[in-house]
Amino acid sequence: MSHQKIATSQRHEKACTSKTTYKDWLPHLQRRVKCDEALPVCQSCGSANRECRWPKPNDNIDRRFLSHRQSRHHKRALDDDVSVVAQEAPNDDQKVISIDRSQTLVLHSLEPAMAHQAMAHVLEPIICRHFVDIYYGLIILPGCHSDFYHGWLTEILRLMSSHKSLYYSVLACATSHLHSIGECVQMRELALTYYSRAITKLSQLLVAPSQPETNDGLLTSIILLYIHGCMGWGTYSDIPRHLNAAMSIIALRLWNRPMGIDRLFDFLAVESVLYHIFHMTTGLWTELSGPNYDSYIDFWYQAENLLDRSSCNTPSRRLASPVIGIPIALFRLALLLRQQRRNSLPLSIDMQSVQSEVFGYEMMLFGSQEPQSTSESSNTQEEYYKDAGSLYAIIVSLLWRQMLPYSEPGPPLEVMGGCWQIRRAIQIFKKYEHDDGWARCFIGNWPTYTLGFFMSATEDKQVIQVEMQRRWDLTKFAQVNRYIGDLQATWAARESQNGRL
């Protein structure tokens, strides 16, 4: 027994007196460096432009006080507020919102005050991930130039850390979208809370001594706020003031540049403002009045001229437009004819010039080939832009033919289903009837909605109805929901009127 103790003592002494070299510790030093797990995105992953693996809610629990009843990580509190369950087995009475491939966030009924406080800590990383993985791809055109797509997203994630207004704008947009997906009232209230915080932070930033025209975080926050008004819920009436703020910043930033736009973000910002000017001033067809068109037209002409002479406006950039995707002149012509229809006044512009533009787009439609199936196309996204442009050109043609100087204001009138414009539009819709990418592309929302007013045949209306419903199912944008309601109400009124005749 004594010999064993001596041997053990000798081994211990030898181990203690031996020198530990750098090579002995090298395996321990070569562990993979983890993300710093900072909100909204870790700096190392953000700078490397790689996917950031965010910690799951369970990874952030301090288990030392887990059993304490007042701990925010107490098991009962988690069960009452938010629980993460397997996606395969949600309960029928629960509101389910898909977050990623492996998990589903299940929101139980909560009191609003509890929802805003208890849910925020757990939800904000997940909401940010929803913005990155799902929402962002719906507010920028599919297949746009990679410098636009990845560049703007990387910039948003970088600026969120230092711009609280941008951080809350991102949360507001993503949370409102989650509300549309899951129809959870608490998520809508939470989205409006984030929206209010973003407005507060913006106000503080604007009164501080600074140069707003050089602040990309400020402009991005404003862009997301008017996108929230357009695509989200509860802030539609705020869009004009956000647009006016963005227009003022862009004017200060770009109007005096003789060489045009040389930064991709500025190009994207100008296109975004033009699209939402179009959205706001066109409004719903049943609205007899709307925003003052004259207050936007000067900005539109200057912005259009700026984009035309921009160094970013190369042929490859035009094919990969981040927001508009069709010729801006066609966009403007559709806006002009829609405005004339609303005001029911003689146009104060050169009618001959408008007629020449309309005939030019009609010749383009006649000269282009019949729509091919998407499987035959070498560039699907390019086909999206081309066919969306054809739909706008068809609308311009139909509006021009219905334009009378003193006609009654209101929606477009029905036309015969056999006319060439309607046949061409139906061909385009049937081409993409199984293409979800097309239905997610937001530039097709307005022409699909507008063409529904021209349809007279039941089968043609059915095509439009299916297309609009598919767009709602795939995007959950409030814009599409408003369009569907307006179109269906008009169809019902026309059927009722025809029944009385």
Language model features with spans:
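C-terminal transcriptional activation/regulatory domains of eukaryotic transcription factors
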Residues: 98-213, 284-285, 311-318, 371-386, ...
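Charge-rich, intrinsically disordered regulatory segments
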Residues: 1-159, 163, 383, 390, ...
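Residue register of alpha-helical TPR repeats
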Residues: 169, 220, 266, 271, ...
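Cytosolic regulatory protein-protein interaction regions
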Residues: 11, 15, 148-151, 155-158, ...
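Hydrophobic/aromatic-rich effector regions of fungal transcription factors
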Residues: 153-159, 171-184, 193-236, 246-252, ...
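Acidic/serine-rich, low-complexity amphipathic helices located in mid- to C-terminal regulatory regions
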Residues: 125, 227-339
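C-terminal amphipathic "assembly/sorting" segment characterized by alternating charged
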Residues: 456-501
